[in-house]
Structure formats: structure tokens, C-alpha cells
């Protein structure tokens, strides 16, 4: 039997990187900068930190469910310190957060997001974004890509709802709309997104294969996997 979205779904919550944003084209440069900051000028250590956080220094590709793929700045900073960064973890987290905000100006969308989001909001579905990035970086990305009119809710790891894969971001989005978590569909490219959906009791956990996750890594937690968010309006239209 083919799985379809239930008609009880009333809103969509998106992950950002790998879901709305082309992960490698956007983040390979940012993550190299992050590793360079953490390495404090040590080129060899920079490559060690890139590998430790999940990015191949040669190809710029990031592994599914690695630190760079799913963790927040605080978690990445502490992981980098554990792997040799001489920078104090709290100071490094602040530096990484700023690097991520700066990098938002070069965000590459995964597809025509205005078209996709316009179709979704036009059908009466409120949209939100929940990311392991900081809230300031998410807001900057939304502004740069001209998506502000489509997005009614934004949550980052530092917004007060807890980090992924805890359920708080989904619960906050539902409360913002006066809905229950079971009326929310979560869309994301890694296991943290889908685990958050399961923990929150979301109505749907939709995996996208446009980011760091694979069908193999996502299928255990996803109700369905689609190529990218470009396929979402048609999936919803079939309800």
C-alpha cells in the first residue's frame, strides 16, 4: 500500500540545511571556515577537525548524521575541542554562531522555494522552520532568500525550545498555531529531524533525499522519503 499524508495535517515544519538549502554548496565553505577558526591557524588540525565533524576535506561532502550534518554550534564546538581545538568551547561556540550567520548570505536554495512555499501556503498550510542552526542565522537565510512572507515560525537551537532531536520545536510550532503535534508534518534530511518528529508525536515524518541523509539512513524513521521539497506540493495535493 502506498503511504499518503492524512488529511488531518494542517501545517508543515521544515528543517533548513539539506532540506531547503543545498547543504554541500552552502556549507562546505562555511564549515571550512569554522574548522579554520577552531584550529587557530593549524592547517593539519583544520583537516582533523573537518574529518571529526563529518566533512571530507578533499571533496567537501558531509556524512549523514555527522556533527556538521545535525549538530548545533555548541555541540560542534565541544566536539572540536575534544578533537584538539585550543579554543575554549564557549568562546568557540560564539565564533561558530557568528560564522554561520555570516554564511547565510551565500545560502543556495535546493529548488525554487518561493514557488514551493507559495503553493503550500496557497493551499492553506502555515509553514515553519526548525533548525539546529542559531535563530539569527535562520532568520538571515529566510531574509536573503526572500521567504519571509511564507514562514510564520522560526526556531533554532537557541530559541528556548530545546535542541533536536528533542520534541520542543515541534510542540512550540503547534502551540504557535493552536494545533496539536499530530497535525504537524515534519520535513527533514537527517535522522535528528525525523527522531524529533517521532518524539513529538507529529502527524508525519517526511524524509528528503536532497541533503546529507540517504534512503537507508532515513527509512527507519520516515513515513515516506521524497527526492526534495519540490515534490511536497504534489504529495499534499494527493491527500
Language-model-derived ranges and their functions:
Residues 19, 131-133:
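Conserved phosphate-coupling serine/threonine residues in phosphotransfer and NTP-handling enzymes
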Residues 68, 108-109, 130, 161-162, ...:
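Residues that cap or flank secondary-structure elements
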Residues 7-114, 119-122:
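N-terminal helical cap/lid subdomain that shapes the substrate entry/recognition surface
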